[in-house]
Each structure stands twice: as structure tokens, then as C-alpha cells.
Amino acid sequence: MEVDTEEKRHRTRSKGVRVPVEPAIQELFSCPTPGCDGSGHVSGKYARHRSVYGCPLAKKRKTQDKQPQEPAPKRKPFAVKADSSSVDECDDSDGTEDMDEKEEDEGEEYSEDNDEPGDEDEEDEEGDREEEEEIEEEDEDDDEDGEDVEDEEEEEEEEEEEEEEEENEDHQMNCHNTRIMQDTEKDDNNNDEYDNYDELVAKSLLNLGKIAEDAAYRARTESEMNSNTSNSLEDDSDKNENLGRKSELSLDLDSDVVRETVDSLKLLAQGHGVVLSENMNDRNYADSMSQQDSRNMNYVMLGKPMNNGLMEKMVEESDEEVCLSSLECLRNQCFDLARKLSETNPQERNPQQNMNIRQHVRPEEDFPGRTPDRNYSDMLNLMRLEEQLSPRSRVFASCAKEDGCHERDDDTTSVNSDRSEEVFDMTKGNLTLLEKAIALETERAKAMREKMAMEAGRRDNMRSYEDQSPRQLPGEDRKPKSSDSHVKKPYYGKDPSRTEKKESKCPTPGCDGTGHVTGLYPHHRSLSGCPHKDRVPPEILAMHESVLKCPTPGCTGRGHVNSNRNSHRSLSGCPIAAAEKLAKAQEKHQSCDVSKSSQASDRVLRPMCFVKQLEIPQYGYRNNVPTTTPRSNLAKELEKYSKTSFEYNSYDNHTYGKRAIAPKVQTRDISPKGYDDAKRYCKDPSPSSSSTSSYAPSSSSNLSCGGGSSASSTCSKSSFDYTHDMEAAHMAATAILNLSTRCREMPQNLSTKPQDLCATRNPDMEVDENGTLDLSMNKQRPRDSCCPILTPLEPMSPQQQAVMNNRCFQLGEGDCWDLPVDYTKMKPRRIDEDESKDITPEDLDPFQEALEERRYPGEVTIPSPKPKYPQCKESKKDLITLSGCPLADKSIRSMLATSSQELKCPTPGCDGSGHITGNYASHRSLSGCPRAKKSGIRIAQSKEDKEDQEPIRCPVPGCDGQGHITGKYASHRSASGCPLAAKRQKDGYLNGSQFSWKSVKTEGMSCPTPGCDGSGHVSGSFLTHRSLSGCPRATSAMKKAKLSGEQMLTIKQRASNGIENDEEIKQLDEEIKELNESNSQMEADMIKLRTQITTMESNLKTIEEENKVIEQQNESLLHELANLSQSLIHSLANIQLPHMDPINEQNFDAYVTTLTEMYTNQDRYQSPENKALLENIKQAVRGIQV
């Protein structure tokens, strides 16, 4: 019972939820601890704090009450020091041994529950955590009144008492090793305080530092998750009770606050000139953490878990000298801090130390690899060395015992001597804790690295576990990640119930659902919207893609309304299926009179999911009741059957649009690869020859909406394999079974749709290499196929069943009835022919619609064995077809109800075709109706009424743009979606004429509707649209048009040969290819021309730049010439040449020419006068600088 309580508490902590024990006692916004006014809380100085998590007083009381449940061997490492006072103090904890054993047993039980047997460390840690919470919750009710100063003083008092008493107890345990059990019992409480000395001092420091509220919240969350996951990840820990108990407010070592604290401690250590020791279990852990790191790690590594106190003492004494110099430095620092504390407010001094204590002591102690022996040995050695260095420590401890530590007191400005001593002593303890914290962090990092290999393996195991289990503990998911980075990652509590559902995730390996087209759902079960489809192995991709293709045999997705996607999963928009519908409807009209045909189905050519395959034509009787199916959730429903595969090695040439397609029925299991065993259809009329094969319920390919199902087939003379394409059979089975659920609910409505199958097959059926079937109806076909009768189990009178069976059996070898099959509840009905003779026409009425007679050109029809009822009977259920959408059963009631007429589109004259949201005759909204008009003007106005309107906008003469499918824009410039164009095309089709504005392009039309030029199609204004889906004239053509034999033959051949075999399409493809090639050539030429133009432009720019340079040079030369001219004129102004005027600008050229001639021909100027003249000229020109 106690273990259950502890586990409940454990789960509560993992969620980060804290529930007060007695909420009625709490005040609305105050700390629930009696005597606590909110001061000193970890999360802030808020008196309105409502939790005991950060309450220092509750922590103190909790630690006092926890000690009786701690096992004695955990305290042996402290038995190193001897103190006479400890002997007297060890007499007040009798009777705690039983509680220790009980605690240990509980810890073992919890460890076994978590699949970690044999770890006392984790057991004790978990037990202490839970005991800690229990005491904490109890203390919440006891600690509400009181004053801050008193609480702080009491706590500081007890902290110092713990220090002194624990030292005494250690000495006593060392000196009296034979009395260890007795000492433990006597000094249990004091020893607990000593064990938690670092915790209490850390809390006091936290009260001074007032760590930010967010840091405290993160600390609580991290510690809770650590405690939650400690049991599953502690493999090397040994007796770690105290460590688990102290993990409640630990912070993440990877946080910024912790890093800052570590940096500050390193600086503090380096300031004392201390060098790290390299003796760390033969590891050079050069973390440069400080002298505390080195010293403490020596003790941690040497002080292995030894339960012998004497061994601990020997290890301690052998290493004391290593720490002397460092402790001396710390002692000096201690005195300095004490003096500062006596003069300043402690809150201004200790925030960094507070951070360190909270962020280092807690995380290190929470580390699973540590043992309490090491912790105790570290602290014991350090404190003993401190006492050797400073005899005043005991004095300060006693002072703290008597007066209490007021370090957290807000009134620390007091400078009395007692307070100074207390502050100094607490500072000493704080520095000790800083040393211990750094040592713990060092060992934690080392042990983390040691456990990386183990964690890697565990991480792999957890991954495989995640694939099998939808839930797991949050800690199990986080721990392997933390080992990768050598430190703990911050983790916030998460409810395990919100974990992802692993059993229905995206089939792409490694995909978590992110980036899916349909949303960020990790449980997406389809490859269609997965952005990582390239990762999918080919076999998986093939399995999924095969289901996504168009179920029409021979269709590659080309010409579909919703683009050229091969993965189209619906018959809606398939041109082949639509053409087949048209052909079938034409034959129906030939067999029905015109007055009745006008009331036939208004959605025969509105292709929906599987409506082309399963609609049963009207040859001799009224067609069976059609059912409309919304396609909103088609893709999702079809995925249920995505793992069922089929083959179509053969396909009946009258299957499409003539009869329900029957998948093979396996006699044993249905494998995901498909139906391997052929369903055999025979024609022996003897019911005794029928054989039964069953569908085994399968999660991957259960074709029944209601669970397991069985199918019966009647076998006889000519057995054959009836296998066909995976997609076609899948869609057929889905469509046939979509009413299975409703069979139990409304048998009367379903009685008009007998779930029977008469399978006929032409052995000479032609299937080309692309799977395209020859569906032409002009071929002669022997009517020697079998007629298996499969009747529903659900309430049906034996007479009706007999009628259904005998109707088919009486056809004999020459004829057979084609009926839809029900795979949900099928059992062979064996009756005698005598019983069928007593059946009245009333019994046949619900089923007579389903019994049809096929009439094809050239075929010999055999009259029905039962009298025919009035053909083309007027009914609202005339041509509601069986839909392949799995959700058809959801709308069956409304579709079969007599009020189904109310579900049609309210637009007058609209039959549902051309609707944006689908070609549903039952569309009840004007939103997507192409014929809906907001202005009240009737769309069906005559051509003359609209001739006077603006013809420039919509190209259809007389159209004002209203009612366009693509928008109510009056300026619409396309005939696409124009209701007027659709109406005129329909009228023209009925009159055998075409419209002038589109008649030029009608020769190359690809829309299967005869006479349709592609205009007005829902999916766009493409004249070459190759689909009947959205064709505004398709429905009217089905209703009223009487196609000629040649036209019907053309349509049938086009549908049977497939789009790929259409010569027009091939020719268009060739033309497109040629155009693409020519376009590529033109683009290459353009690129060359652009390159040449660019080169020429660059050359032109270069020439222009050169010209500019030349012009600048010319300008400079002209300027220099002008200067020289002026200088020459000034120099020769006084020299008069013979026969010339004095030099000036006007005769300058002539003057220069004369001078040049004189100097060139000096021989002619040898007279003294000329020589003197030349000499004067030389002297005058000599001063000119050229």
C-alpha cells in the first residue's frame, strides 16, 4: 500500500503538479508552511507563494523527519572523525533501524517495478524522494504563521548544529566501529542533518540570492523529471539515498545560469593561484574548473564506495596535504567575505554563490552514478582540513548553535559581533559547498562520458520500443539525448498520455509527420503528402502508389479533371469512365421511351467515385436505386484498403459500367500482396455444386465495414480465374461493400439494391499491354458464363432470397443476370424450384429492379423467366448508382428516402452538373452552381433577349458575365464556366448545330462529349479538355440526345482503347514535342544573339572610352599650343622680319613659316643683317619652355 502511495506521488511529481494536502487550511495566496511568511522562497520573496517547493522552513523540517528512514550503512563513510561531544549526541534516534529497512525494501520494490533490479542506490533515492514529498506535504499544513526572521534564524541555527553534530558523529563512528548500528540509531536525526548540511546551506544561500522565478520553475521541473527517470537509467549507482533526496530543486547544467556560475567559480579559483590535479581516475580531465575541482575530485576518485570508515579515514589522511594550500587560500577568502558580510547586506553579495549551490550541488547529487560514500568522504575531508587550519570553526559552529545564523535576515546591516561570527562561519560552509559542487560536477561529466556507450545501446532499444508502444515515460525519451551532450538537457514535465501514437504514423521511414501537405500530423498514414517520399523504399512506394492510381482499367491519369496526375484515386473526372457512362446511358435511352428517359438519372455522366463501374443500366427493367456519395473523405477511407492488392490479368469487356466488379475471393487468408487464388465462377444451375470460400478478417484488407465477412460463389462447368487490376478490384470491392453497415439498419431500403453478382466473362477478351480493355459493345459474346448468386444475410424473406437465386439459376446457359455483389454477409441460399413458384409479384418488387437484361447489337436475348414489370417506372430512385466511395453508407438513408428530391440544387433548371464542389445532383447550395444568378435574371433567357447587352466582356454573345463559375465578374473574358454558353451548347447539341464563336475549333476537340468544344468546362476554358467531368453538356446529352450508331461507336472505341491510343492525342503530343524542340532551338539562338549583343555593347563602350581619352589629350595639346603661341608672340614682338609686319595672332602662322624657312635655308641668309636677325631670334626664343 505504501509503495502504491509512493508511486502515485512519483507520477504526480513527473507531471510537475503539486497538490496541497489540506487546501482548506491554506490561505488563498500564502505559503502553506505554518510559520512561514513567504520570505526566502526559491521562486522569490513572495509572501503569497502557494507552494512548499521553495519554502526553506518546510525543507528544514522535512530533512529532520527524513533521517529515521535512512539505512545505517549509508552513513558509514562519515565515520572518520572523532569528537567527544558526538558520543553524547548519539542517544536520541533509537528505533529507526526498522524504518530504514522498510525504506530500503520499498525502494527495492520500486526498482523492480521499473525493471532495474539490484540497485540500492536508485531504490533509496526514489524512496527518499517520495518520503521527502510526503513530509513536505505534511509540513505544508504546519508552517503558515510566523515571521521571516525567526524562521531564518532557526534554520541557520540548525544548519550549524548539523555541522557540529555530524562532525562529532563521524568521530564517534570512527572510534567505535563496533557500535555502528547503535550509533546510527542514536544519532539518526543529527546525522540526517549532517547528511543534508549542504542542502540546508544551499537553501540559505538561495534565500539570499533570490533566484529568479523562472530559474526555480525550471529547477523544479528538471528535478521532477530526473527523479521520474532515475530508476530507468541508474545502472552504476550504489546507495544514493541522499543524492536522490536532494535533487528536488536542481537546475540544468547546460543552462546559461549554470555556465555563468561555473565561469565565476573558475575565476575565483584561479584568483587563488590553484592548479588542477591530473589524478582523476587516470583521466586528464582538463576542464580547468578550479582548485576546488582538483581537490574534491581527488577525494571523489579515491573515496570509492567503502563502507568501512577506517578505510575512508586512511584515504582522507593520505590526501590531506594536497588540499592544504588551497584551503588556506579559501580560508583567507572566507575571512574577507565575512568582513564584507558584516558591513553589507548579504543579498548584495551572494547571488552568484546561490546560483552555484542550487545549480551544482543539486545536479551533481542527482547524478545516478554517484554514491553517498563519495559525497560524505569529500565533505568530511574538506571540513576536517578546514578545522585543522582554523580552530575557530568549532567556535563558530557553537555560536551558530546558540544564536542562529542570521545570514538570510533582511536586517543584515547590523554590525554586532555575534552576527559577524555567524556570517563568517556560514561563509566558510558556503565555500566548502562550492568546492563540493564543482567536484560533483566534474565527476558527473566524467561518469556521463563513461555511460555514453551504454546509453547509445539503450537509445536504440528505446527506439524499437517506441515503434511498438504508443506511450512511454518522458524520461526514457530524454535520457539518451542527454548523454549525447554530456550534460542534462532541460526538460519540462509532459503528460505521458499526450505522447504520439506510434501505431499509425506516416509510413515513410524516419518521418514524424512534419511538413505533410495535410498538416503537421505525426499520425498521417499516407505517402501522398509526405515531403520525404524520396526516402521510401521502392517496394513500399509501389505498394502505396498502386492504390493511389485511377481505378479505371487502362487509365494512366491522363486527361483527368484535376490535372494529369497518375495517382488520381477516383473515377470522378476520368474520361474513359465518363465515356463508358455515356455509351451505357445511350443504350438505356434506346430501350426506354423518351418520356421516361427524361426522368432518368441526372448524374449518369457526372463521374463520381466508382459510379461508372457499378451503375447498372436499364435494359429490361428499371435500373436499381442509385446512391450518391460525397467524396469529401474518399482518400481517407480508401487508405483503409491500401494494403489490399489485386491483379487484372483478365477483365470482362462488359464490366465497366455494366456490372459490379468482383475481386477474387481467397479460400484462406487475404495477403497484402493480393488475391492469389482465383475466385471461380461457374454456371451450373444446380445449387448443390456451389462452393463457399471465405474472407478471413484482416486488418490490411478486410473488405467488410462490419468486421469479418464471407463470400459464396456458385461454381460449375466452365471455371475461370477472374482476376483484374489491383486498383479496379479495390475500388469495386470498396464500392460494393459500402452498404454493408446499413444492411443491418435499413433492410427495406437496401432491399431495392440486391447484393448479388452474376459474373460473366468472355474468354476471348482482349487486354492490351497497358491494361486497356476492349469495351466495345458491337462484339458478339457467348452468354455461357456463370451466374453466382450472393444474397445478403440481413432481414430478407426466404421468398425474396429464393427469387434472387432462382431468377439467376433459371437463366440457364444462355443468359445471366448482372447484379452487384455483397461481400459483407454472403451465404449460399439453396432452395427448391417449387418454393419459387409460390412467390407473389409483391415479393419480387424490391428486387425486380436489379434483374436486368443486357441487350447488345447482334446478341440473342432470352426473355426473363419472370414477367416483366412496366419498364422505366417513374421513381426517384431510378438511377442512383452504387458508389465506390467507402462513405456511401453514411448517406444511404437520405439518398433513398422519398424526400431525396429536396436535396437537389435549388437553382431552377440545374441538374447538379458543373458544380464547383462536384457534379452532385444533390447539391443543396447555390455556392458552386454555374447556373445560379444573384440578380434574378433567368439564365435560360433566349439568345435574342441578351443580344442588346454588352458583348465585349464575356465572348458569349449576350452574356453579361453573371453566373460564371470562376466568378461573378461582368468583365469575364472567357466562355469557360459561362452558363449561357453551356445552355446554348446544349441546345445546339440537341439541334445538331454548333455555335459560331467556337465552331472553328470543334474539329480538334478532345472532350468525349459529342459536339463539345471544351468551353464551359468546370475545370477551365481548355478547348482540348478530354474529360466529361464538368462538361456542361454531358448530362443533357445523357438525358435527351439520341446518338447515332457511328457516334456511339466512336465514343465506345475511344473509351475502350484508352486515351493513350487516341490518335488525336498522339498527334497532339507529337506536335507539342516538336514545338518544344523548336522552342528550345529558338531559345538557344536567342541566347547566342544576346551574347553577341552584349559583346558588341561592351566593345562600343570601350571605343567610346578611348575616344574620350583622345579628346582629352587633344584638348590638352591645344591648350599647350595656345600657350606656346602666346609665348612666341611675346618673345618675337620686338623682332621685325623683312617684308613682314610684327608678329601677332593674325600673321602668326605666316611668321612661323618664315622663321622655319630662314632656319632651314640659312645658306641663303648669310648676310650680316640676316645673321644678326637670326641671332636675335635665337636669343628671344631661348627663354620659351616647350
Swiss-Prot record:
Binding residue positions for Zn(2+) 3: C550, C555, H568, C574
Cross-referenced Pfam families: MYT1 (PF08474), zf-C2HC (PF01530)
BP-aspect Gene Ontology terms: negative regulation of transcription by RNA polymerase II; nervous system development; neuron development; neuron differentiation; neuron fate commitment; neuron fate specification; regulation of transcription by RNA polymerase II
Positions with a binding annotation for Zn(2+) 6: C1007, C1012, H1025, C1031
UniProt GO molecular function: cobalt ion binding; DNA-binding transcription activator activity, RNA polymerase II-specific; DNA-binding transcription factor activity, RNA polymerase II-specific; DNA-binding transcription repressor activity, RNA polymerase II-specific; metal ion sequestering activity; retinoic acid-responsive element binding; transcription coactivator activity; zinc ion binding
Annotated keywords: Autism spectrum disorder, Chromosome, Coiled coil, Developmental protein, Differentiation, DNA-binding, Intellectual disability, Metal-binding, Neurogenesis, Nucleus, Phosphoprotein, Repeat, Repressor, Transcription, Transcription regulation, Zinc, Zinc-finger
Binding site for Zn(2+) 5: C954, C959, H972, C978
Zinc finger (CCHHC-type): 22-65, 497-540, 541-584, 896-939, 945-988, 998-1041
Compositionally biased residues, Acidic residues: 86-169
InterPro entries reported in the protein's UniProt record: Myelin_TF (IPR013681), Znf_C2H2C (IPR002515), Znf_C2H2C_sf (IPR036060)
Binding site for Zn(2+) 2: C506, C511, H524, C530
Region Disordered, residue ranges: 1-21, 56-175, 220-247, 342-372, 449-513, 659-709, 753-780
Phosphoserine: modified positions: S250
Binding site for Zn(2+) 1: C31, C36, H49, C55
GO CC, alphabetical: chromatin; nucleus
Main location: nucleus
Physiological role: Transcription factor that plays a key role in neuronal differentiation by specifically repressing expression of non-neuronal genes during neuron differentiation. In contrast to other transcription repressors that inhibit specific lineages, mediates repression of multiple differentiation programs. Also represses expression of negative regulators of neurogenesis, such as members of the Notch signaling pathway, including HES1.
Quaternary structure and interacting proteins, as annotated: Interacts with SIN3B.
Protein family: Belongs to the MYT1 family.
Disease: Intellectual developmental disorder, autosomal dominant 39: A disorder characterized by significantly below average general intellectual functioning associated with impairments in adaptive behavior and manifested during the developmental period. MRD39 patients show delayed psychomotor development and autistic features.
Full protein name: Myelin transcription factor 1-like protein
Native organism: Homo sapiens
Lineage per the UniProt record: Eukaryota, Metazoa, Chordata, Craniata, Vertebrata
